Amino acid sequence: WYSSMFAANIKQEPISHHHHHHHAHHSHHAHDSNSNASNSPHQSPLPSPNPPSHTNLQLEQYLKQQQQQQQQHQHQQQQQPMDTLCAAAMTPSFSNNDQNSRGWWSGLPNPMQTIMPANMRPSPTATAATTATDCCAPTTTAAAIALQANDKLQALTPPMDVTPPKSPAKSQQSCAEPEKEHDLMSNSSEDMKYMA
């Protein structure tokens, strides 16, 4: 559900943006010709500057809205599927981290699936990650930067701190068993510090 909503939102945004733009343009044209035809030439300067400013206002509001939406998406991305996103984004990007992150991830599926709702299972989230890559590069770049930062943090703090809501159960489950993976992880992120 989450990933499909996410993909739908992302796909709709550019379309609705274009549509909105055209729509505003049309109404502004119609308004222009109407005002010129029906109103006296005296008044036509008033309505004709009016629609553009109105359009600009609409567009500004819409852009602000879009920015907020994108920020929300970023927050959602970073809060909810952070761990899946971590695995998805780190595995292709950092060859040095490849095996380590895979090993670390393979140690986690059970606790993750227990804690995450069904829609947060690796496969849908992976699709959400790919949609993000395709549709809005900025968000993904920001997420990747955040991931790098998180990776550096993981050298100092265990990954559970990234997702507070899941931390208690996860820290018990994952720390009890795949501690080797955590050591690998912190080593590799220290390597990354020197690489980056």
UniProtKB/Swiss-Prot annotation:
Residues 33-43, 65-80 have a biased composition (Low complexity). One of its GO terms (biological process) is segmentation. It comes from the Eukaryota. It is found in: Nucleus. GO terms for molecular function: DNA binding; zinc ion binding. Residues 177-196 have a biased composition (Basic and acidic residues). Keywords: Developmental protein, DNA-binding, Gap protein, Metal-binding, Nucleus, Repeat, Zinc, Zinc-finger. Its main location: nucleus. Gap class segmentation protein that controls development of head structures. This is Protein hunchback.
